[in-house]
Amino acid sequence: MTIMRKSHPLMKIVNHAFIDLPTPPNISGWWNFGSLLGLCLVLQILTGLFLAMHYTSDTTTAFSSVTHICRDVNYGWLIRYMHANGASLFFICLYIHIGRGIYYGSYLYTETWNIGILLLFLTMATAFVGYVLPWGQMSFWGATVITNLLSAIPFIGQDLVEWIWGGFSVDKSTLTRFFAFHFILPFIITALAMVHLLFLHETGSNNPLGIPSDCGKVPFHPYYTTKDLLGAILLLMLFMTLVLFFPDKLGDPDNYTPANPLNTPPHIKPEWYFLFAYAILRSIPNKLGGVCALVFSILVLALLPYLHTSKQRSLSFRPLSQTMFWALVSDLIILTWIGGQPVEPPYIIIGQVASILYFSIILILMPMAGLIENKMLKW
């Protein structure tokens, strides 16, 4: 008689994905972030569902409905802050997950990598439309500025913007449709995450050495279930510390002022996790050029499998490429800082240099470092 988990049609799928999955024996803590992203997604869907029960997507009542959630709903303040800070946590895990993929050459699993990029785009879209919903000052003006960027598209730009707005400005219809998008997108993300896993399990996981580990794989359970559980506990401790002690640390004070189309905030800026892209957008004086740079700053990740020049997969034994990688991380931190600063000297030139450096490292310097290291292997 076979074990039920191996014979039952539903249990069999779970078994192949999370129990008997052959896993490399040497994957480090950096491989925990995939499961942590799953945890973040579940957390966001659950808290979002409870918020949607009390939220109203109408310009006259949206702001007061969020206030009502925080003041009158049982533990509404907790659900609201868990959802708001959960987005930040999601992006922290997401950026570390992408960074690990770049460092250890996981992008060579092209299908998994490309679906990951699509997931990143969808997550960014979800976060953007979600940020508009509380209908505070920064929500309204953020929506106005970012949707207006589409008007840079030749011929159809202006029509496209008005079609998305549902009128001639960001108004009631915009808020209603953004709420609809914000509700449906996480479920599309969940479905795509399953496809992401499906493609990953076709090839098996990469490992820190970047070499095949078929000869020494171990079952996922109990080794990596316990390891993922430890990661989840540590992450939740960090998360609840943020939610309970510093709930507004990552938010914008302007969002505690109701949206007013007649009063523009002095500095319009997105949440911290979009600041690097916002800095790249602002560093180009031309509107269409800025929009193209903004999109390409994420799309450039899709070129990584084709820019891989090294004979080795991982950066573990490639000091020159490691230097380039950490220069890229430092550059992204600088871009994030610049994105939050006003458009004035010296921030303008710093942003422009950092933007050029960002594309140079990915498109030129890292492939060159790979070629130099190939030469060094022959010495």
From Swiss-Prot:
Residue numbers binding heme b b566: 97, 196
Cofactor binding mode and count: Binds 2 heme b groups non-covalently.
Membrane spanning residue stretches: 33-53, 77-98, 113-133, 178-198, 226-246, 288-308, 320-340, 347-367
Binding site for a ubiquinone: 201
Alphabetic keyword roster: Electron transport, Heme, Iron, Membrane, Metal-binding, Mitochondrion, Mitochondrion inner membrane, Respiratory chain, Transmembrane, Transmembrane helix, Transport, Ubiquinone
Coiled-coil segments on the chain, per record: none
GO MF terms, alphabetically ordered: metal ion binding; ubiquinol-cytochrome-c reductase activity
Cofactor dependence: heme b
Membrane topology, from the record: Multi-pass membrane protein
Binding site for heme b b562: 83, 182
InterPro entries, alphabetized: Cyt_b/b6_C, Cyt_b/b6_C_sf, Cyt_b/b6_N, Cytb/b6-like_sf, Cytochrome_b, Cytochrome_b_C_euk/bac, Cytochrome_b_N_euk/bac, Di-haem_cyt_TM
SUPFAM superfamilies attached to this UniProt entry: a domain/subunit of cytochrome bc1 complex (Ubiquinol-cytochrome c reductase) (SSF81648), Transmembrane di-heme cytochromes (SSF81342)
One GO location term (cellular component): mitochondrial inner membrane
PANTHER family: CYTOCHROME B
Additional comment: Heme 1 (or BL or b562) is low-potential and absorbs at about 562 nm, and heme 2 (or BH or b566) is high-potential and absorbs at about 566 nm.
Similarity field: Belongs to the cytochrome b family.
Subunit structure: The cytochrome bc1 complex contains 11 subunits: 3 respiratory subunits (MT-CYB, CYC1 and UQCRFS1), 2 core proteins (UQCRC1 and UQCRC2) and 6 low-molecular weight proteins (UQCRH/QCR6, UQCRB/QCR7, UQCRQ/QCR8, UQCR10/QCR9, UQCR11/QCR10 and a cleavage product of UQCRFS1). This cytochrome bc1 complex then forms a dimer.
Protein name in the entry: Cytochrome b
Source organism (scientific name): Cratogeomys neglectus
